[in-house]
From Swiss-Prot:
Gene giving rise to this polypeptide: nbp35
Subunit structure: Heterotetramer of 2 nbp35 and 2 cfd1 chains.
Protein name listed in UniProt: Cytosolic Fe-S cluster assembly factor nbp35
Residue sites binding [4Fe-4S] cluster 2 per the record: 257, 260
Pfam families to which the protein is assigned, alphabetical: ParA
Species name: Emericella nidulans (strain FGSC A4 / ATCC 38163 / CBS 112.46 / NRRL 194 / M139)
Record-stated family: Belongs to the Mrp/NBP35 ATP-binding proteins family. NUBP1/NBP35 subfamily.
Subcellular location(s) of the protein: Cytoplasm
Coiled-coil residues: none
């Protein structure tokens, strides 16, 4: 249930997503969480005063999953954006992907920021100062335009510079609220921006979305081997978790001069880059997106780079990635972006 108009957001965020067991002592540092399947059974549970309480807590299927499935039934495609390493431009790419899909006025797009401790999507989308609105239907996304909506923990913080210092169970609880209580309405694409790595948030999103039918994941890398090393682990995670990999995108593949559009290689692909990795791992290569300093400027100002600089090599590359993703989720690429070159 969404917070009431009289209840402060900070109070609501401090509350768990559902009533936990009545613990008799604080949770230890490596506690798996009272709601975890390993509650009372993990190595960290040995000697904990709460062990018997957690072990006897109700287990079984999450009763909220049918509610999430019903809530997202009107969302046609759900796409995860993953990266094995921080700093590869995953959130920037997520915002570009959302703007790319939304450049078709016939498509309605949402972007959900599940990077709870480092939410940057609102800034990139130009809605950082907005707050969540509540109706009888649930939480309303913050709309960037008529066909592009955003949901992020950033909208719920009293101050924009406040740190979110939460352990896994509380972060997972908020992700569940985003999926269960946000009224996305009729939507063509929901893009889920995740934190780097393979953390609780990834497991939570995957388990909660499994019944509602997640289309798959787009994995983002940069050309260097230090990034590819972590991407291999991310691909392994997807396969073990049963997440379909829609394809790999190589971000920052070169530098585009904004004056002459000449492309120079800044980060050298010492081991073949994303394209070679995709071939070796047996996954589609969706494309290479070059660096353009105007991308950072557009994100700082919360504007659409794709719309403002449509002829940039980076914009053209993003459009091709959008068409490729559309094709892999079962759409006609020509209907996804009719005017893409």
């Amino acid at each position: 249930m969404a917070p009431s108009f009289t209840e402060t957001t900070s109070t609501y965020l401090e509350a768990p997503s559902k009533a936990p067991p009545n613990l008799v002592a604080p949770e230890p540092e490596h506690c798996p969480g009272p709601e975890s399947d390993q509650a009372g059974q993990g190595d960290a549970c040995a000697g904990c005063p709460n062990q018997s309480i957690c072990a006897s807590a109700p287990k079984g299927p999450d009763p909220d999953i049918p509610l999430i499935t019903a809530r997202l039934a009107s969302v046609r495609h759900k796409i995860l954006v993953l990266s094995g390493k921080g700093g590869v431009g995953k959130s920037t790419f997520s915002s570009l992907l959302a703007h790319g899909f939304a450049s078709n006025p016939d498509s309605t797009v949402g972007i959900m920021d599940t990077d709870i401790c480092g939410p940057s999507i609102p800034k990139m989308m130009g809605v950082e100062s907005e707050t969540i609105h509540i109706s009888n239907a649930g939480w309303s996304p913050v709309w960037v335009s008529d066909n592009l909506g955003v949901m992020s923990v950033q909208f719920m913080l009293p101050n924009r510079d406040d740190a979110v210092i939460w352990r896994g169970p509380k972060k997972n609880g908020l992700i569940k609220q985003f999926l269960k209580d946000v009224d996305w309405g009729e939507m063509d694409y929901l893009i889920v921006d995740t934190p780097p790595g393979t953390s609780d948030e990834h497991l939570s999103v995957n388990s909660l979305l499994k019944e509602s039918g997640v289309d798959g994941a787009v994995v983002v890398t940069t050309p260097q081997e230090v990034s590819l090393l972590d991407v291999r682990k991310e691909i392994d995670f997807c396969r073990k978790a049963g997440i379909r990999i829609l394809g790999l995108v190589e971000n920052m593949s070169g530098f585009v001069c904004p004056s002459c559009d000449h492309e120079s290689k800044i980060f050298r692909a010492t081991t073949g880059g994303g394209k070679r990795l995709a071939k070796k791992m047996g996954i589609p290569f969706l494309g290479a997106v070059p660096l353009d300093p105007r991308v950072g400027m557009a994100c700082d100002y919360g504007e659409s780079f794709v719309e403002n600089f449509p002829d940039s090599p980076a914009s053209l590359a993003i459009k091709q990635v959008v068409r490729a993703v559309g094709r892999f989720v079962g759409e006609d690429p020509d209907s996804v972006l009719p005017d893409a070159e």
